[in-house]
């Protein structure tokens, strides 16, 4: 009996070895993973487009058979809720967590827990101080403020009264961009900040705050605006006031602002609006997903994945008539705006990149994948 049992054990062991040997790389690649996307707040089109792009990337031929599930959650401006969502994602078997963190420090404990469980944690756009993350994908936020501030200073010839509008107070992105901008303005003694208010990264809020400031000070006391959100509504307030010449604005990359910078009459909404625009790339979340699978496949990434953030002026503005993948490739991803009939004025338009070549403007609008991708 002992001999028989020993023989059975040997046979089973050999069979197990044979099965292991027969597992091919393609079969190993068939393993599917749970992906979670955690955003610190919602309510603006930047994050809506960012999560749409992640959704679209997850449905491309490259990744659709490798993802068991994609879960997208928003903490709605509550860091404690976001920490709870991260912990719950870990307990439910997440392999990848992509995160736009609401706080640079309040999530560190939850992130460490995820790292200890072997979860790939990648932050995008907004940063955290916890060093265990796999990588952060984003821009140089200081330059995000400094670059547009320098552009506005040049448009004003180094002097004038400006309104200064940040984003959401206390968020790392807001803090660093504001510091970068004010550092530049400090070098121009002729530029004075005469009013300051938060835009909350919401065009409606920006419009309300700007209307209050203009009502209190009058248009003649204002020479320009630096803002993280609101250049388009700033121009609309001037149009409504029937001002002949628009004041320069430096701000983010909404489609309305970018269209307004185009030559008047070239497309509906074009106003020859003087300004400089630098939008934080929205495709960073989708790119983060590709980096997560790069790590799963044995590749390596640095702790900070810096992505480009071009400065858009009237001189280098390019309108894409369709915004589909074919046109993006033909124009070498130089498009800075699309017609307002395709994407509304409050839609953040920096949604495409050669680093995410499977996606187009419609991927950001609705999470769809271009044909063949």
What are these regions (language model features)?
Residues 5, 22-26:
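Serine/threonine-rich, low-complexity intrinsically disordered segments
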């Amino acid at each position: 009996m002992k001999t028989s049992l020993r023989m059975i054990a040997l046979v089973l062991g050999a069979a197990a070895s044979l099965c292991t040997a027969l597992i091919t790389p393609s079969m190993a690649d068939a393993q599917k993973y749970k992906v979670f996307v955690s955003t610190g707040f919602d309510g603006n089109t930047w994050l809506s487009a960012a999560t749409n792009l992640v959704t679209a990337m997850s449905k491309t031929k490259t990744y659709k058979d490798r993802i068991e599930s994609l879960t997208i959650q928003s903490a709605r401006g509550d860091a404690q809720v976001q920490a709870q969502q991260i912990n719950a994602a870990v307990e439910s078997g997440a392999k990848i967590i992509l995160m736009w963190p609401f706080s640079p420090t309040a999530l560190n404990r939850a992130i460490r827990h995820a790292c200890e469980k072997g979860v790939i944690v990648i932050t995008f756009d907004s940063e955290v101080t916890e060093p265990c993350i796999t990588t952060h994908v984003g821009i140089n936020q200081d330059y995000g403020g400094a670059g547009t501030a320098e552009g506005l200073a040049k448009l004003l010839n180094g002097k004038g009264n400006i309104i200064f509008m940040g984003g959401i107070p206390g968020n790392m992105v807001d803090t660093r961009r504001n510091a970068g901008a004010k550092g530049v303005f400090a070098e121009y003694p002729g530029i004075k900040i005469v009013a300051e208010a938060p835009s909350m990264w919401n065009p409606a809020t920006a419009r309300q705050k700007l209307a209050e400031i203009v009502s209190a000070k009058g248009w003649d006391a204002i020479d320009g605006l630096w803002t993280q959100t609101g250049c388009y509504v700033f121009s609309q307030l001037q149009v409504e006031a029937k001002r002949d010449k628009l004041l320069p604005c430096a701000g983010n990359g909404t489609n309305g602002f970018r269209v307004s910078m185009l030559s008047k009459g070239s497309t509906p909404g074009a106003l020859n609006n003087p300004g400089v625009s630098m939008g934080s790339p929205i495709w960073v979340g989708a790119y983060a997903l590709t980096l997560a699978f790069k790590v799963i496949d044995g590749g390596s990434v640095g702790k900070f994945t810096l992505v480009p953030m071009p400065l858009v002026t009237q001189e280098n503005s390019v309108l894409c008539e369709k915004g589909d993948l074919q046109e993006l490739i033909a124009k070498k991803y130089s498009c800075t705006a699309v017609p307002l009939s395709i994407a509304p004025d409050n839609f953040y338009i920096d949604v495409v990149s050669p680093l995410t070549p499977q996606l187009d403007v419609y991927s950001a609008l609705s999470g769809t994948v271009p044909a063949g991708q």
